[in-house]
Amino acid sequence: MKKIFAIAALSLPLFSHFPAFAGASDELKVKLTEISSLKANFNQTVTDINDKVIQTGEGVFALSHPNQFYWHLTAPDESLIVADGTDVWIYNPFAEEVSVMDLNQAINASPIALLVHSDDETWSQYNVSQKENCFDISPKDKDSGGSEVQVCFNDNQLTKMVLKDQQGNISDFTLTNQSVIAGKDQDLFKFVVPDDVDIDDQRLKSTN
């Protein structure tokens, strides 16, 4: 079950029956850019293809432009995802394992990384549609294996994210207690590899 949270967070664009317009993509990018940084608590509910709740959780989410985000699941089991601007680190304390990949790899695997990425070429690979205060993001290449995500706003405040994965599971994330990143919170985007953990380095680039 722990993998559900890690995959959901990382895969963190839903699926709508409304047509995609270029204007929706542009408007979403503007909204995300206006959120230069964000820290919030989240509550997560995961339902399966039969709409049965299979897990709940809570934790802390943060983002900062460009290319930095932080996802710390604190209950029921701990896991951590940190994008430091170049690499994405996925830490499972229970398994004592860290996986690391390039940011671009993470975007290809999971469009949630688009929340802090403004590259036009990357965005051009996704359809974006809008219904009221929510935006649905899905890969244009249906064979890419990418997930679909919905993000919702209250005015310019990001309040909700919904993920549908390839197995039909839906993860609903509600954000509360939003604040701007300040002071020591900048350290959230710096991942220090713990001692005595296995490192699965999946980066395509040459490592230092």
Swiss-Prot record:
Monomer. HAMAP family: LolA. One of its GO terms (biological process) is lipoprotein localization to outer membrane. Its main location: periplasm. Participates in the translocation of lipoproteins from the inner membrane to the outer membrane. Only forms a complex with a lipoprotein if the residue after the N-terminal Cys is not an aspartate (The Asp acts as a targeting signal to indicate that the lipoprotein should stay in the inner membrane). This is Outer-membrane lipoprotein carrier protein. The keyword Iron does not apply. Pfam families: LolA.
